[in-house]
Amino acid sequence: MGKRAGGAAAAAAAASTSSAAGLEPAAGRGGGPRSAAAGLLGALHLVMTLVVAAARAEKEAFIQSESIIEVLRFDDGGLLQTETTLGLGSYQQKSISLYRGNCRPIRFEPPMLDFHEQPVGMPKMEKVYLHNPSSEETITLVSISATTSHFHASFFQNRKILPGGNTSFDVVFLARVVGNVENTLFINTSNHGVFTYQVFGVGVPNPYRLRPFLGARVPVNSSFSPIINIHNPHSEPLQVVEMYSSGGDLHLELPTGQQGGTRKLWEIPPYETKGVMRASFSSREADNHTAFIRIKTNASDSTEFIILPVEVEVTTAPGIYSSTEMLDFGTLRTQDLPKVLNLHLLNSGTKDVPITSVRPTPQNDAITVHFKPVTLKASESKYTKVASISFDASRAKKPSQFSGKITVKAKEKSYSKLEIPYQAEVLDGYLGFDHAATLFHIQDSPADPVERPIYLTNTFSFAILIHDVLLPEEARIMFQVHNFSQPVLILPNESGYIFTLFFMPSTSSMHIDNNILLVTNASKFHLPVRVYTGFLDYFVLPPKIEERFIDFGVLSATEASSILFAIINSNPIELAIKSWHIIGDGLSIELVATERGNRSTVIASLPELERSSLPDQSPVTLASGHFAVFRVKLTAKKLEGVHDGAIQITTDYEILTIPVKAVIAVGSLTCFPKHMVLPPSFPGKIVHQSLNIMNSFSQKVKIQQIRSLSEDVRFYYKRLRGNREDLEPGKKSKIANIYFDPGLQCGDHCYIGLPFLSKSEPKVQPGVAMQEDLWDADWDAHQSLFKAWMGIKENAGHRLNAMFEVNTDLQKNIVSKVSAELSWPSVLSSPRLLKFPLTNTNCSSEEEISLENPADVPVYVQFIPLALYSNPSVFADKLVSRFNLSKVAKLDLRTLEFQVYRNSAHPLQSPTGFTEGLSRHFILNLILKPGEKKSVKVKFTPLHNRTVSSLIIVRNNLTVMDAVMVQGQGTTENLRVAGKLPGPGSSLRFKITEALLKDCIDRLKLREPNFTLKRTFKVENTGQLEIRVETIEISGYACEGYGFKVVNCQEFALSANASRDIVILFTPDFTASRVIRELKFVTSSGSEFVFVLNASLPYHMLAACAEALPRPNWELALYIIISGVMSALFLLVIGTAYLEAQGIWEPFRRRLSFEASNPPFDVGRPFDLRRIVGISSEGNLNTLGCEHSHGRGFYSNASSRPGTGSHRQCGTSVHPHSSHGSKNSADVDNVRTRNSSSMSSRTSPQAAASQSTSKTSPLVSETAAATQGHTASRKSRGAKQGQHSSQHHSHSHSPLEQHSQPPPPVPQHQEPPPERLSPAPLTHPSHPERASTTRHSSEDSDITSLIEAMDKDFDHHDSSPLDVFTEQPPSPMSKSKGKGKSLQQRKAKPPKKQEEKEKRGKGKPQEDELKDALADDDSSSTTTETSNPDTEPLLREDTEKHKGRPAVPEKQESELSQGKPKSKKLLNAKKEIPTDVKGSSFELPYTPSLENKQRRNLPTKIPLPTTLASGSKSRNPPKTKGTNKLVENRPVALSKFLPSSQELGNTSSSEGEKDSPPPEWDAVPVHKPSSSTDSLYKLSLQTLNADIFLKQRQTSPTPASPSLPTAPCPFTSRGSYSSVVNSSGSDTKAKQTSSSKSKLTKAASLPGKNGNPTFAAVAAGYDKSPGGNGFAKISSNKSDFSSSLGISHIPVDSDGSDSSGLWSPVSNPNSPDFTPLNSFSAFGNSFNLTGAVFSKLSRSCSQSSQRSWNEFNSGPSYLWDSPATDPSPSWPASSSSPTHTATSILGNSSGLWSTTPFSSSIWSSNINSNLPFSTPTNALSSISLMGTENSAAAHTPSASGPADDLGQTYNPWRIWSPTVGRRSSDPWSNSHFPHEN
C-alpha cells in the first residue's frame, strides 16, 4: 500500500515538473494564452497526485503515507493550489467498532458527497469538512483511503481535531468510464476507529471524444504509441494550447514524426475530429506503469481540466501483443460507409507463432474480419498486420453491437488467447430532403434563374446544428447558397428551412452531379445536387478509330460490313428511347444489348456484344448510368463510289443523328497472312514475322496507319526502312515486321532468366541472382521460376493474341491477327539421357552434348557434376522428377567418372570476368552467344567394372538448372590363352623330348638339325569388349625373342566371346634346360595380358645339342680380321716405344757430351757464395734481373723474404708452352729453350710497361692478366682433373726471389691495389689449364730434357735461373690430404725423381747457377707460408753487411708492412684449424718420401703457414687491415675453378703452378740434414752449372707491378717481399722495363694464359702439390706481397699487365673468371701484414720496422726464415710454378731488382751460417726450373726450430736423380703448354 502511495506521489512530482512535450513550441507559435502558468502547474500537480494515487489503488485502500506532503484546496481563483503540511505516521488499521447512530464522535459536512455527472477525463474537486462535536476528546486522524481509482482524496488539513474544532480534506472525482460510480472513503483515527464517507458520481462521454488509455499490455523493450484524437464540439476552431505528460517513459510526439510544426497542426476545425499528438510509451522495465496526459485548449476555463490516465502493463512473458489497447471506431452514422481498422500484433516469444483465427466476441453482424492465416516471426521488433476489422454502422441495430472484443487465437498452446476490445458510437438517424429540389434541367434555349428552398428533416435522437454549407467548385458556376448566415439548429424529429439554392443555367450544355457539403455537429452530410441536359452520349466501338461517326471505309463492291456503336445515359434521370431508324441505301440497324455500365464496361464486353443480338427490337428505357448497343450494317450492292447515310435515335429530349460514311471500290486490300502465328518465345527471345498486304485495286493505295488493336505492349511493329507508303496495284507488298517481346511486360520478374554474377563480381543486385561459385541455392531459384511458368500455363496465359490494323486511303481496318506462344526454353538440344558404350576401365569413351542458345542474349553455362553439390541426394530426386528423366536403379551421387570437356579451342571471356574453360576441377564454363550452337564432350572414365549413372547439372542463367543423365558401364578386357587366365600361373608349356633331339646324337648329319617345336594356342576374348591386339611381345621383344617366335604376329581383333589361334615356335639354344619367358599381348586400349612361356629340355642332352647347332657363316671372317688388327697394333706400339726412347736418349747424350767438354768451374776452388753474389751483381745481374724476370716471369716477391724458412720457390721456370706428356724431356727442353728465348726477348719491355702501368692502373692490368690466366687455365682443366690430386704440402710457395742489380731506391706512391682475400679452404682456384697434365712417359725424360735445356742454356745466357724449392713439411691439411688413394700409388716415385734431378743438376756449372740464382734472387725468395718474419731482418742485415746492398726503399718496407698484417690474419685463421686435418681433395694422392721424412722432422708445432693451409681450408680468411677493404672471400669463386680435388691439387702456392710444367717439388728432394756445408757445396756446384741453362730457360716476362697500397711511409709499390726484407732500393729501371713489357702478345708465354705457368710464389696460394702449401695460389705474384701488404683486392697473379709472367693460376680479382681470396697468405697463413706490422713499418719507414715481424707472427719463428743460428738451409718448396719471383708476382716493378739478392740465401739460415757467403736463392729457382713436373716442394720451416727439423743438405744434383715413372705420375705436366715459338 505504501508503495502505491509513493508511486502516486512520484507521479505527482513528475507531473509538477513535466513540460508540454511537443506542444510547448506549438503553443508558443500558436499564440494560445498561457495564463497563470504557475497556477496551472500547481493545479496539474494536485490533480496528478490524486490521479496517480487512484491508478495505483484500483481495488486496494488508498494509503496516504508520510511522503505525501500536499493538501488540496480551492483557491479564490478557482485553480487548484498546493500547500505543504506535516507528514503522517504509517497507516495502522485498527479493529475499533464504529460508533453508531448519534453517538458518532465525528460529523461530516456534507454527510455524503455527490459529484453528479462529470465527463470522462475531466476531474472535479469538492471539499469535505469534519467536525469534532466532543468537548473533551481530541480526534487524531491517521489516514484516508478509497477503493476505486475514480475518486482521490487529499490528506486532512489538520491532523488533530480539537474538541469542538474542525478540519477539511478534498475529494477529486476523475471519471474513467461512462456510467455511475460510487465509493466509500475510509478515515482512520488513532483512538476512535475507522469512519466511512460515501461519494458518488456519474461518468458521461467526453465532449472532446477523448478517452483514457487503459489496459494496454506490451512486452519489455517495445512501445505503445496511441494517437490522441480530439473532437471540436464548438462552432469555433479549437486550438490546443498545451499538453503535458507526467512520466519519464511517456513522451509526446507529433503524429507525423516531425520535430515541430505550425499552430495549424493543433487547430481543430468546428465539429471535426483531428489527431493532434501521439503518446509514445517506451517500456524499459517489467512493471505496471501509470502516467497522465494534461491537455489545455483555448476553450478551457478555470474549472475545466482534461486529464487522460495512461496505464500500461509491461511484462516479460512471451506471448502475442497488440499495438493498441482498444479498437476505437469513433462516432459513426448509420448511413456512413463501413470504417476499417487494422490489427497489428507482435510475437515476443522465441518461436514462430501461426495465427489461426481472428473473430469478434460475441458474434457481431456489424463487425467484419478480413483475415488470412499468418505466422508471427519470433522476437521481431515491429508489429505485423494480421487482420482488418471493419464496423458497418448500418448493421448495428442494438447497443450491444457497439462494443465487444476481438479474439485472436494462435497455434501455440502455451500462449493464451489475445482479446482486444473494440467500441463504436453509432448515431442512428439521417437528414431527409426532397430530391427534386436539387435536380435541375438545362434546356437548349436560355432559361431564367431558379431559386429553390432547401428543407431538412432531423431523424436523429439529438439536435442537429447546421454549422456551414459548402458548394463544390464544379457547382459554383451555376449555383449559389442564399439565406444562410448563421448556424441552424434542427431539433430531433423535426424539419426546418436551412437555405435557398440559387440556380443560374449556363449556355454550355454540361452535366453536374455533385454534392453540397453540410457541416454539422454530427459530422458532415452530403446533399446531392444534379444538373442534366437529357442528351445521350454515343461512341463507335473499336476497332474503329473515329468515334463520332460511323465510317465503313473502302468496301469492295461485293463486300458487306457491320459496325457497333453504343449510347449511354449519363443523366441523373432515366430516358426512354422511343425509336431508331436509318437514312440511306444499303444500311440496316439493330439493337444488340442494354446494360448498366460505362464506356469501359462496353469496351470490355465487346467480344460478347459482337456475337449477341436481341430479338425484341421494341423501344427501351435507359436508366441513369445504363447503355444500349446497336449494330449498323452496310451492303455495297456492287456499287462504286462514296456512300453517305445516317442513323437517328429519338428520346423525349432530343433526336440523336449519327452520320454513316463508306467508299465502295472495285478491289480490296488483304493482309497476308490473315492469321500470323509467331514461333514460341520466352522472355529474352524476341520473335517476329513480316506483315504483307495484297493490293487488288487498280490504283496505288497509300498507307496511312498501322496500329495494334490490343493493349498488350509485348506486341509491336516496326516499319521497314526504305519502304514506300504506296502499295502498288496488283502486288503484294511487305509493309512491316510484327514483333513479340515477352520480356517487355515482366521486366525483372520474368519466369525465365536471372542475373549472373561471376566470382569476381560483388553481389550488388537486391534480388535473386546466380553466382558462378555458389550453386547450392540453384534448385530454389529454378523452382520459383518454374512455378511462375506453371502458373502462366495453367491460366492459359502462355497463348497470346493481338490484332494489327492497317488503314489506307482507300480501305480502312485491314486487320491481321497475330498469335504468340510462351514456352519454357532449354539450352540442351540433345537428349537428356546420354548412354556411353561399354568402356574399358583403362580407357575413356566420349559422347557429345549439343547446346544451343535459344535466347537473344548471351547465356552463361556451367557443367557441374552432381557430386559437387552439398546435398546431391535431394537434388537428384527433384531433378529426375522435374525433367522426366528415366528412372535408374541407383544414381551414384559421388562419382566423378564423367567429366565434361570443351570442344572449342578459343575460350571466350565475358566483361564480368566469366571465362570459358575449366574454372576448377570437373567444372566447365561456357558462354553461348545469341543463337550459338556448341557441343561439349563428356568423357566417361570408369574406375570399376560396374554400371554408373549420374547427373550432370547444366547451370545457366536462362532456366537456372538443366540436367543430363549420364549412364555408362565400365568393364575390363579379358583374354585367355589356351583357356588360361593371364598371370604367373598361366604357363604355356613347350616340352622338348629326347625324341625331338635325336639329331643331336646323329653324327652323320645328313641334313641340318631342326630343333624347333611348334605349338598352337587358342586366344579367347572372354570379356564384353572387343579386343584389338596390337603387339605380341616375348620378354620385351616383339614377336620373337629368346628362342620363341609368334608366327602369325600381326595385329588382330577379337570381338566379344570370339577366339583365334596363334602359333608359337620355340627353338632352343641349349644353354639351359628350362627357358621361362613372358608372352605379352598389348591391346590398343593399353591393356597388357602376360602369360608365361615355359620350355623344358632334357638336361643331359644340352651339351650334345649345343655342339650340333650350326655355326654362323661370318664367324671365320671376323676371327681373321680381329687377329690382323691386333697384330698391327702390337707393331705400332713397338715402333712408338723405340722412337720415344730415341727422343729421350739423344738429348741426354748431347748434354753429357757437352758437360764433359765444358767443365763448369774449378772443382778444387772453394764454394764462395759471397764472391758469386758479387760477380752476379756486378757482372750480369742487371741483365739477369731484367731478362730473367721478364723471360721467366719470376716476380721477386714484393716481400722477398730472405729468411723465409721454406721459400716456395716458384722456380720451375716452366715454359709457358710446356710439352705434353707424350713428348720426351728433350722436347721439353727444346720448348723451354725456345720459350725462354722468346720470352726473354719480350719481357724486358713488358716489365717496363707493367711498371708504368702499375703506377696508373694496377687493377686494370691485373684484370687483363687475370683474364689471360683464367682463359688458359680453363683450357686444360678437364684434362687435369683426372690426373691431379690435391697437393698441398708447401705451406709457403715462395718462389726464389730474383735479385736484380739494385737500382736506387725510388719510392713510388701508387694507388694501392685492393687487398686480396686471404685464402680459405678453396684459396686459389686451381687452374688446371696452367698445369701440365700430361706426365713424361719415362724416368729418363727428366735427364734428357735437362741435358737439352742445358745445351740450349749456353745459347741463352739471359734466361732466368730455376727456382729450386725445398720440400717443406706438409701442412696438416696437406698431411691429411696426402693420405688419399693416389698417395699410396705414388709414394715410391719421388726418390727416383729426385735422383734424376740431382744428376741433371750436376751438369750445370755451379757458379753460373749461383749467378743466375742471384739474378733471380728477388723472385726466388718467394714468400713461403713458413717464412718467418722474425728472421727476415737478420737475413736482410746479413745481406747488407756482406754485400753492401742498399736498404729496402721505404715504400717497399711499407709494402712489406702492409703485407704482414694480412699474413698475420691468415696465420690466425690457420691457428683456429686443427692441424690434424683429414685428407682433402686438394692434396696430391700421394706424399713423397722426402715429405714424409720432413713431416717426421717437424716440431710439434706445425708452422703457422701449415696451420693456415689447413685453416684456410675450413674458413674464409679474415679481412685484412690494409688500406683497401678485402674482397669477399672467394672459396665459391675458387670452387668454380676447383671442381674436384684434382683441380686444386694442380695448383701450387705459386701463381704459375698450374701453368707450369710438373712441379719441382719432385725434383727438389730435401734430405735429412747431413752437413750443411756439404749440402751447400753441392748446391753451389749445381747452381753454377745450371746458370746458363737457367738463363736459357727463363722465358716468362716480368710483369709490371701494380701499384701497392699507399702507406704512411712511401715504399715501393708492389715491392717484392725480398725488397722489403732486404731494404733494397727499388730498381727504377727494371721497374720501367717491367712496366713497358706489361702487355705481352699471345706469342709470348703468358703465365696462366698461354700455357706458361705463372709464378706461384705467394704462399697464400693453396699448393695442392705434395709438399705444397695447401693454399691454392691465393697469394700469387701479387698476393705474395700485395696480400702481405694487406692489399686485399690485388690479384696475386700479376701487377695487372698482360705479361704472362705476371699471372698465376690465381686470376686477377678483377677478372671475370676469378675472384681472389681476401687476405694475402704469404706463408700459407691468412694474415694481414697491413695492420700492426706495416703500421710499424710505416712509422719507421726503415728496415727496423721489419723486426716487428715476430710481433705479428702468432706462430713460432720457424714459420719464417731460419734464424741465424739455423745452419740448415731453408729450401723453398714452391710447387710447379714458373720462376716468377714473389716480387714480380706482386707486381713490384720498381722493386724487381731493387733489392740485393737475399742477405741470407734461401737455403742458408743466417749470416752466421756455416757458409762463408750467402747463397743466392735464385740457385734454387734455377734448379726449380728444371723440374718440369710438380714444382711445389714442401715448405721447410726454417724458423727458430732446430736445424735438423727442416734444414737438410741440399744436393742440387738430386734434382735430376732418376725417378722411375715419376713424370708419368706427376699431376702437372707440360703437355698443356703448347709451343708458341
From Swiss-Prot:
Composition bias (Basic and acidic residues) maps to 1326-1339, 1349-1360, 1392-1414
Keywords attached to this entry: Membrane, Phosphoprotein, Signal, Transmembrane, Transmembrane helix
> What's one Pfam family here?
Ig_TMEM131L_3
Molecular function (GO) terms listed? Answer: collagen binding
Choose one Gene Ontology CC annotation of this protein and give it: membrane
Main subcellular location of this protein, as a coarse class:
membrane
Q: Where is this region: PapD-L domain?
A: 107-281
So which stretches are on the Cytoplasmic side?
1137-1877
State its role.
Collagen binding transmembrane protein involved in collagen secretion by recruiting the ER-to-Golgi transport complex TRAPPIII. May play a role in the immune response to viral infection.
**Quaternary context:** Interacts (via PapD-L domain) with COL1A2 (via C-terminus); the interaction is direct, may occur with other collagen proteins, and is involved in assembly and TRAPPIII ER-to-Golgi transport complex-dependent secretion of collagen. Interacts (via C-terminus) with TRAPPC8 (via C-terminus); the interaction is direct.
This protein is called: Transmembrane protein 131
Q: Which organism is it from?
A: Mus musculus (Mouse)
